[in-house]
Amino acid sequence: MNICFVGFGNIAQAIIGGLLKSGMSSENIACIERNQQKIALLKEKNLRMIQLENLASENFDLILLAVKPKDALRTEKDIFDSAPKSILITVVAGIALNKYSRPGSVIRSMPNTACAFGKGITGLYADDQKSHGFKNAIKLFSRTGYVLALENEGEMHRFTSIIGSGQAFLFQVLKVYLLELEKISFNDGNNLNDVFNHFVSSLGDSFAEEPDFENLINRIKSPGGTTQAGLESLENSELDKIFREAFEAAKNRSIEISNEQ
């Protein structure tokens, strides 16, 4: 499969990183980018650079649109002007298919940065999910992690807030945890990052063993104990409400981006 990325921002870099780690050859990946710093990074990674006007002659299986929302619709038109038969996957958040000039040839995707190490979760939506292009999109993102085909496009806003943005919300919580861990004095032989990484990986292992958060919490807390005191503090601070509002804010921003186009 030969693919081309139009734009080389964070999410494009994550996807490409995951594809290369999955065994895809760099010879099968091309990029279109104007930013000089990113061009230098492309050269460091030995990725092929092409020009937009050469798209048609390259005969790519998929073209991934990975530009800023404000540039997405103009760039999409330029792509189809250059290569009218293209199948385009957009990773741009918030912009509905009907905003594009050729929605029947566009597949919406919402990957997250965990694609870089094969642990990504990507949501896909297209009007025709039985098409060859959609099947190729599933094959492509399956190299970078787990793929979900959404039943309707409206779900993409919430998927964006939970999967696309949600990692950052949890990172914010873990950042607080790390700051608290740094207050403890360890012997020189103890590596703080190793301790933290061990803790974080244990969370996933615990859930794999027991996929019920209430049971996991009950295994740790005891009546009148330290965990109970901390949990009551979180409840008094309305932590659940804070997270729900964060997800809602991200979802609403996705809707706003769509309405701005």
Placement of each model-derived feature along the sequence:
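N-terminal Rossmann-fold NAD(P) dinucleotide-binding loop
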Residues: 12-13
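Internal alpha-helical scaffold of NAD(P)-dependent oxidoreductase catalytic cores
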Residues: 100-105, 121-158, 168-209, 253-257
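Glycine-rich Rossmann-fold phosphate-binding loop(s) that bind the pyrophosphate
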Residues: 8-9
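Aromatic pocket-lining residues of Rossmann-like dinucleotide-binding sites
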Residues: 19, 23
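Extreme N-terminal starter segment of soluble prokaryotic enzymes
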Residues: 1-4
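Small-residue helix-packing motif on alpha-helices
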Residues: 29, 72, 187-195, 216, ...
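NAD(P)-dependent Rossmann-like dehydrogenase/reductase catalytic/cofactor-binding core
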Residues: 194-261
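Rossmann-like NAD(P)(H) cofactor-binding subdomain of soluble oxidoreductases
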Residues: 16, 30, 36-39, 45, ...
